[in-house]
Regions:
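Non-catalytic, conformational "gating/processing" segments within enzyme and secreted inhibitor domains
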Residues: 151, 199-235, 435
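His/Glu-based metal-binding/catalytic segments typifying zinc-dependent metallopeptidases
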Residues: 244-306, 338
Length: 459
């Protein structure tokens, strides 16, 4: 045996041991079962017999976080083309006929860090449904005529979104928050890229990311995990691994931190009601998972009707709605405040928001009871979210793509463990005196009256 062969064997053993140790402490809720196939495909089976249905979903670590300006929006286009044609059903008419035969409800979504596809049908159709999913994910057919039709559909989604002033404001804020890497936080894409998408570009995406070792298969519903694992292995077991982690092979560049506040005003004739939006670069699961938990708890506190933020803005008539949220991401999640201000009190609303933010880190900004109430809301929200079996696969696949299965399992318990010190660390690290982007969208007529530039500016 040569030294090169010995080194290769040693590397393979080390990799195997690392994989085994990575999953040795895997935690899942009761009724959830996990298995990794030899090709790297992870399979989660969720036994839930509330109704005689099964939902199958496959999630891929793909989405806008993998896209540069040449491919922006094409993960979304790829998702649409998934439902067109494949080796077993070579036309969309045949594909759709098969969904009707299965009695399937189906859809897909594309986000920052996940693309997922799912079908729900009678439990008796599980074997046939998994074969149908297998054909679509592994053996797609991309025809120019199909793509020409779907370009219009995908771009139509974009154009409809642009008719919403809230989308217009969000789009401009995001461009400024993420700078040169905006495309990696822009799942909807770029018009020109969508309208010139080709089969060749679809195959580039497929050959980069659509491998079993970059995917999670979830089988949920009135099923038994042992037989479901057997079906998964029989149907997906010969799907060839890429041989390496695609996310490591095609590294994701880090986002550049904001260096100063960026405040802008956007006039739009469709903005019948003005909106304000503010965004910070928040925590990343990969580097600060604890703060992703604290972020959700704090956001819930300040959206309580009893919170100082709501009382200062909504109860005092400065705004009709104030929402605060953080989106968990592996690669830098956004922290957002969205406000529907009183058109007659825009200056006062903006000034009071800044005043409230400056006080967020004061020990008396929220009470122990409000902290307890926020944790209770998060617990109840989790219970309600898990009432519908067909929604469970999307919940766990989102976490698998952006965090981990353990994070999903522990999430609700971890909310209950959040302390004031955890929240203070989150606020100090990401919000208090940290640069942000702020935007106001307003109609030209209203702006003539209020002269927003005289007060809506960096301070």
């Amino acid at each position: 045996m040569t030294s090169k062969t010995i080194k290769r064997c040693a590397f393979m053993v080390a990799a195997l041991l690392f994989t085994m140790s990575s999953f040795a402490q895997l935690r899942l809720p009761a009724g959830y079962y996990w298995k990794q196939l030899p090709n790297g495909l992870q399979v989660v089976v969720i036994e839930n017999s509330k109704v005689p249905l099964a939902t199958v979903q496959i999630a891929v670590k793909n989405g806008s976080f993998t896209e540069d300006s040449v491919y922006n929006g094409l993960s979304h286009m790829f998702e649409h083309m998934f439902f067109k044609a494949n080796k077993d059903y070579p036309t969309q008419a045949q594909f759709l006929k098969r969904t009707q035969e299965l009695g399937a409800i189906w859809n897909g979504t594309t986000g920052y860090e996940r693309v997922n596809y799912f079908f729900t049908f009678d439990t008796d159709s599980l074997n046939a449904g998994l074969k149908f999913l297998n054909a679509a994910i592994r053996f797609p057919i991309y025809r120019i005529e199909d793509m020409e039709k779907e370009r219009k559909v995908v771009d139509g989604e974009f154009q409809r979104a642009e008719s919403d002033p809230g989308f217009q404001l969000n789009f401009e804020v995001e461009k400024r928050v993420w700078g040169d890497l905006f495309t990696r936080k822009n799942p909807i894409g770029i018009h020109d890229i969508i309208n010139t998408a080709t089969p060749e570009k679809m195959m580039v995406i497929k050959n980069k990311y659509y491998f079993p070792n970059n995917s999670l298969l979830i089988i949920c519903g009135d099923v038994h995990h042992e037989s479901a694992f057997t079906l998964a292995e029989n149907i997906f077991g010969d799907w060839a691994s890429s041989g390496s982690d695609p996310i490591l092979k095609y590294p994701i560049p880090p986002f550049k931190p904001l260096v100063k506040n960026d405040i802008f005003i956007k006039e739009s004739t469709i903005a019948k009601t003005p909106y304000m939006m503010f965004e910070w670069q928040g925590p990343s699961y990969a580097t600060d998972s604890a703060s992703t938990i604290a972020a959700d708890v704090f956001s819930t506190i300040v959206t309580l009707n009893s919170s100082k933020l709501q009382q200062a803005l909504v109860d005092k008539g400065l705004a009709t709605n104030v929402s605060v949220g953080y989106l968990t991401c592996k690669y830098t999640g956004p922290i957002q405040i969205f406000i529907v201000p009183n058109p007659n009190k825009l200056k006062e609303c903006y000034a009071e928001l800044l005043n409230q933010i400056s006080m967020w880190n004061n020990p008396d900004y929220y009470t122990d009871d409000q902290l307890k109430d926020a944790k209770g809301i998060l617990l109840r929200n989790d219970i309600m979210a898990k009432e519908k079996p067909s929604s469970l696969p999307s919940q766990i696949s989102f976490m698998w793509c952006s965090t981990s299965l353990n994070y999903y399992t522990d999430n609700t318990d971890d909310y209950q463990k959040v302390t004031r010190a955890d929240i203070k660390k989150y606020l100090d690290t990401y919000l208090i005196n940290k640069p942000f982007v702020g935007g106001l969208i307003i109609s030209p007529d209203l702006n003539k009256t209020v002269n927003a530039a005289s007060f809506f500016a960096a301070k």
